[in-house]
Amino acid sequence: MLLKNLEGGQLRFGEGRISGYIAVSLAALSLLGVLAFHFPEYLTTPELRAAYDVELIRLIMFIALIISGSLGLLNFVRNTNKRAGLVAWSLITIAIALGGHRVEVSDFEQSSAYLGLDWFILDLLGSTLIFVFIEKIIPHRKQAILRPEWQTDLHHFFVNHLIVGFVLLAANQFVSNAFGWAVERGSQEWVQNFSWFSQLLLVLLVADLVQYALHRVYHEVPFFWRFHAIHHSAKTMDWLAGSRQHIAELTLTRCGVLAPIFILGFDKSVIDAYIIIVGFQAVLNHTNAQIKFGWLKYIIVTPQFHHWHHSSDKAAIDRNYAAHFAFIDYIFGTAVRGQKEWPEAYGVVGDYVPEGWIKQQAFPLKVKS
C-alpha cells in the first residue's frame, strides 16, 4: 500500500512524504546490506566484492542509517500519515539488531551460484543519484520521478541484478561448451597485441554487431518479439525503464555477446571497461534527458536515438537497433531518418502487454487464442 500510494504522485517539499519515502528506501537498502554482510558467499558478487572497499561500504551504511532515522523522525513530525516513518524505523531496528554497519564477516568459500544483492544496492544508489539528477537538470519531458509503471520497472531492476550470478554462470558454461572449438591461440594473441584502447573499440564494435543482429531477430521474428515486447511495453521513458526485460531475452543476449568476446580473447581489463561502458550507456540511453550530442549522434547511440527505437510512432517501428554505435543502423539502412528531434509516444502498438513483473514473464509463454 505504501508503494501503491506513490505511483504517479507529485511529491512536494514540506509535506513530510519525501522524507518518509527516502527514509524507507535507505533503511531497506541498509537492511539488505547487513544481510549481504552476513551471507557474502550467497548474496554478493565476487568481482564487485574484490573491487570495493569494505570499510567504505560500512561507512556508507552507517550514514544511510543515520539519514534514514533522521528523516523517519521528520516524517513523524511533518506528515499526518506516519506509516513511512514507522516502516523506516522498523527496518532500522531490524538492521541494527542484526549487527548494523559493524556486522562481522566470517571466513567463507564463494558459492558457484550467488545472488547479486550488493550489485543491486550499489547500482540503485549510484544510478538514482546520477540519473535522477540529470533528468531533473535537463529533462526532455516534465514527468514525476515516480511516474506510472515505476513499480514494474523497479521489480525488473531488482530481479535482473539479483540473478546476475546465475545468468553469468549459465552464459559462461554455454559459451565455453558451444564455442570452445572456435578458440584459436594465434587469433587471441593477435587481438591481445592491439593497444588497450584499440581492443576496447573492437570489443564494443564486435559486441554491438552481435547485439544488432539479435535485436533484429527479436523484432522481426514473431516468436522472439513476444519476449522482446516486454522491453518495449514501457510507455514512459526514464533511467529505470531500460530494466524492463524478460529473463529469457536477457540470458540469450548475454550468451550471444559473450561468444565473440570469449573466442577473440580480449584482455580482462578491456572486458571490465566494456562492462562499465555497457552498463552506463544502457541506462543513459533510456533517460528522460535532453542531452545535445551534435554530430556525435550519427556515430554513437544517444538517448534521442534510442528513444526513437522505443517509439510507437509508425516511422520508428523496427528502427535504430544498435546499442553503442549509431552508424551501424545507418550502414544497414535501419536508422530513423527525416523525423523531428524526439518521438511523441512510446510503448507497444496496441498496448497488449500486461503490467507487473510476474505477468510479463509469463506473457510470452501464453498460447494465443
Predicted regions: what they are:
Residues 50-64, 119-129:
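Structural signature of hydrophobic alpha-helical transmembrane segments
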Residues 330, 340-369:
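Cytosolic-facing loops and C-terminal tails of multi-pass membrane proteins
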Residues 103-132, 147-165:
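Alpha-helical transmembrane segments in multi-pass membrane proteins
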Residues 69-79, 134-144:
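C-terminal ends of transmembrane helices
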